[in-house]
Curated annotation (Swiss-Prot):
Entry keyword annotation includes Glycoprotein: no
Protein name as it appears in the record: RNA-binding protein PNO1
Region of interest: Disordered: 1-65
Subunit structure: Part of the small subunit (SSU) processome, composed of more than 70 proteins and the RNA chaperone small nucleolar RNA (snoRNA) U3.
Its job: Part of the small subunit (SSU) processome, first precursor of the small eukaryotic ribosomal subunit. During the assembly of the SSU processome in the nucleolus, many ribosome biogenesis factors, an RNA chaperone and ribosomal proteins associate with the nascent pre-rRNA and work in concert to generate RNA folding, modifications, rearrangements and cleavage as well as targeted degradation of pre-ribosomal RNA by the RNA exosome. Positively regulates dimethylation of two adjacent adenosines in the loop of a conserved hairpin near the 3'-end of 18S rRNA.
Subcellular location: Nucleus, Nucleolus
Biased composition, class Polar residues, residue ranges: 1-17
Organism: Xenopus laevis (African clawed frog)
Basic and acidic residues composition bias: residue spans: 26-43, 52-61
Record-linked InterPro entries: KH-I_PNO1_first, KH_dom, KH_dom_type_1_sf, KH_PNO1_2nd, KRR1-like_KH1
């Protein structure tokens, strides 16, 4: 037999190593040089505020209607202080164009500071108290929404006046109730309605106001918004 003759002759099988195993063994035997190996993740150093804002200074202009000149003058320091000290922006009231002008500078570090300041001033111009409008600077999830009574229902004359009266209530009771339950702030300026709050809260307040405009009695509206508010509280 051939197999028996090969075994008796003392011949043995030769092991063959593949190219991959040879390369792997050579890589393991080679000393590790940590300095030459590139890092797996790119390392980007933080950008300074002035580079992030760019070379050009940005500016926002907020027009001021004539009936808000006096309140703006009386509350100027309350508006000026948080914009300059907290947001590191420049602000002035242009007497010629009747605009509040807000501008970035070298000290400005926050990219969204200009938008926050513009929303803060715009909220005050719309009729919100300075203390309430200041929440737009401190918190990120607050928004402004404006609409007119005629957007919900085309009313005129006495019908429009009655709809506005239903929203306000006797001595402002209805408006205050909606504000407290939905945790929003509401301003009634003639037929315009301005709401400030978080997205969900604005939605609840808007639904309640629309129901009042469409003719729902206040007691029914109170019950609906309280039920929605309690469901939202349970959800979170």
């Amino acid at each position: 037999m051939e197999i028996e003759s090969a075994a008796t002759s003392g011949e043995s099988f030769t092991s063959v190593t593949s190219k991959k195993s040879r390369k792997r063994r050579a890589a393991e035997e080679r000393p590790m040089d940590m300095g030459e190996q590139p890092s797996k993740r790119p390392d980007f150093p933080p950008i300074s505020g002035d580079k992030l804002m760019g070379d050009k200074d940005e500016m926002r202009k907020i027009p001021v209607p004539s009936h808000r000149y006096t309140p703006l003058k009386e509350n100027w320091m309350k508006i000026f202080t948080p914009i300059v000290e907290h947001l590191q922006l420049q602000v002035r009231f242009n007497l010629k164009s009747r605009n509040v002008e807000i501008k970035t500078c070298k000290e400005t570090t926050d990219v969204g500071a200009l938008t926050k300041a513009a929303d803060f001033v715009r909220a005050f111009i719309l009729g919100f108290q300075v203390e309430d409008a200041l929440a737009l600077v401190r918190l990120d999830d607050l928004f402004l929404e404006s609409f007119e009574v005629t957007d919900v229902k085309p009313l005129k004359g006495d019908h429009l006046s009655r709809a506005i009266g239903r929203i306000a209530g006797k001595g402002g009771k209805t408006k205050f109730t909606i504000e407290n339950v939905t945790k929003t702030r509401i301003v009634l300026a003639d037929s315009k309605i301005h709401i400030m709050g978080s997205f969900q809260n604005i939605k609840m307040a808007r639904t309640a106001i629309c129901n009042l405009i469409l003719g729902s009695p206040p007691s029914k509206v109170y019950g609906n918004i309280r039920a929605v508010a309690s469901r939202a509280a349970d959800r979170f």
